Swiss-Prot record:
Required during biogenesis of c-type cytochromes (cytochrome c6 and cytochrome f) at the step of heme attachment. The lineage of its organism: Bacteria, Bacillati, Cyanobacteriota, Cyanophyceae, Acaryochloridales. The keyword Thylakoid applies. GO terms for biological process: cytochrome complex assembly. It comes from the Bacteria. One of its GO terms (molecular function) is heme binding. The gene is ccsA. GO terms for cellular component: plasma membrane-derived thylakoid membrane. The keyword Thylakoid applies. May interact with ccs1. Keywords: Cytochrome c-type biogenesis, Membrane, Thylakoid, Transmembrane, Transmembrane helix. This is Cytochrome c biogenesis protein CcsA. It comes from Acaryochloris marina (strain MBIC 11017).
Amino acid sequence: MDLVLLQNKLDNLSFAVLFVTMLVYWGGLAFPNIPFFPTLGTAGMAIANLCMACLLGARWMEGGYFPISNLYESLFFLAWGVTTIHLLAEWLSRSRLVGAATAPVAMGIAAFAALSLPDEMQSSAPLVPALKSNWLMMHVSVMMLSYSALIVGSLLAIAFLIVTFGQPVELKGSSIGTGSFRKREPQAPAASTASNLDEGLSMGSAQATAVLTPVSTPQAPSFSLNRMSLAESLDNLSYRMIGLGFPLLTVGIIAGAVWANEAWGAPWSWDPKETWALITWLVFAAYLHARITRGWQGRRPAYLATGGFFVVWVCYLGVNLLGKGLHSYGWFF
């Protein structure tokens, strides 16, 4: 069996399937009454996941080592991780919006790996002595899975902001809510609130931070119950995916420190990759701290997770391509 030819076919097939799957998910949002779109999208993600798993398996058989030693391999491992976390998130939520957010990212990763990287970066090569260690699988695979979970969680936070138009909302279970959906309204003039509220309560309601019965205004459109239910689902699912990715990131950083100490005699050298991994850890630690101890929900943690989305990409790809250090792939410099 020609493993190189098989890999070439599988990486192009993965890209093609993900591209079609992205269109299917977007079509499902545009035409929600067509019943087979969600099932077709899930099937497409599962097929792409299987194709990339076979690609990585063939790569492993060809090179004789776990295939996460260069940019091409790590990109497909990341895309495989994103599709795996997607399938978990979609199973938990049953929402077609999950695929509409994650499929374009998975497709973009596969396209970059299959169509943009030079041929010499796509070919398998013997490992350098420093990488011939069991820590390669332990450290890098866990880091890549953490990136996958954090990326999916951040994408769901971005989807939450889109669904709510970036408006402040109080969700079920909020530390400041009462167990029902409420939208925070700007302070309305007394003339407009008098027609909706009892005269004896109008002065108190003018200073309240939330109105139990929202008043539609040009600045603050009211939301339907379905939209608010979707927003709550996205907020909760984003929290759970980031809650999955953060421990993996922690374990991956610790494993990397142990490996570095074994290979170079120092657990931490402030390499650009190490520095940005620490920044990523701090961003998502702040996210979880705000949610767990401060009771944040909705817009504020979603903005923090959105920032974390870009930090993850700088940590993974930006530093590797542009930075100087032990983790640089040296494509641009």
